[in-house]
Amino acid sequence: MIFVGNDWAEDHHDVHVMDEAGRRLDARRLPEGLAGIRELHELIAAHAEEPDQVVIGIETDRGLWVDALSAAGYQLFAINPLAVSRYRDRHHVSGAKSDASDAKLLADLVRTDRHNHRRAAGDSVQSEAIKVLARAHQTLIWARSRHTLALRSALREYYPAALKAFEDLDDRDALAVLGRAPTPEQGVRLTLPAIQSALKRGGRQRNIAARAREIQARLRTEQLAAPAALSAAFAATTRATVAILVELNRQIGDLETSLANHFETHPDADIYLSLPGLGVILGARVLGEFGDDPNRYTDAKSRKNYAGTSPLTVASGKKRAVLARHIRNRRLYDAIDQWAFCALTASPGARAFYDQHRAAGDLHHQALRALGNRLVGILHGCLRHHTNYDEQRAWAHRQTTPNTQAA
């Protein structure tokens, strides 16, 4: 058996090959792409007869290079860069670092400590596609939130009447009217037909006349006025931000359609959609981040730990503390947090579980995290047994338990 450390970069890879005793067999720098992967295969073939005799450590689990390594049948370990950094300190305290030494470090790590790490997951291509779309969709939503906050901040400086007229600045009504009247003066001069025309172009189909009268009245309320030059400058930034938000809304809608199409054809989609609080978008996010490799999580606890919902125990001597996990997959945790919140109105059992934790003294987010942890465990059981969610089976055992239990 041989061990290969692969320190990757954008245009090259440093690799280090060693045997079971830790002796160096070869080390070199390879180019990214087809030529580099071909040279790596030839290098490995010179020291190993079968692919399963090759163990590779690399600090990523995605990309064309990683796909090629997995397709070749090598034992691939995707090591968290933070773990690699801690491992480096275990051997060297001087702080010295190089790409070549990192490749050797990775080879040593999978040679001696691979039992403490998991092999790269064997998720399906369909699951990977859902993950790509779900992350892109969520990234655009986060971008929309940032631009909406920037727009709100700008309007506070020169156009407070607009904030009274529109509660949601990323809404189609707000964007349509602000795009037409980005200054207070233009807002005051807007006629009802002009506002109605803007609302129609924005996509509104009902209550147009009533909404137009409401907007006109609020835009014409008295307000403090900024200097003309400053107002004109802010108007330019408002027009730009409105244009960005309009396009973001369009692209988010397109991605949402594509994401739904991919998710609904996945074999596990029905199981995810059967769970309370999970719709198409949230279900796709959760599936994409968890993946669909049936052997990735050995038990429910492993899935909960990966989700970051399970409590973390820190004990030393007589001191013991149970804390929330903060090193976690942010995208997955965000989706589970929303899932737990939505489940409160969709599942009586989830609501009772949440209320029990609140009654025991937990704050809202603590109780929500405990509920999310419980829901992840239920999801694991459904996927393991290939069965849809059943409200009675999921919560019946808790109805006879008077005290709140840890999820």
What would you call each of these model-derived segments?
Residues 1-407:
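A detector of single, family-specific signature residues
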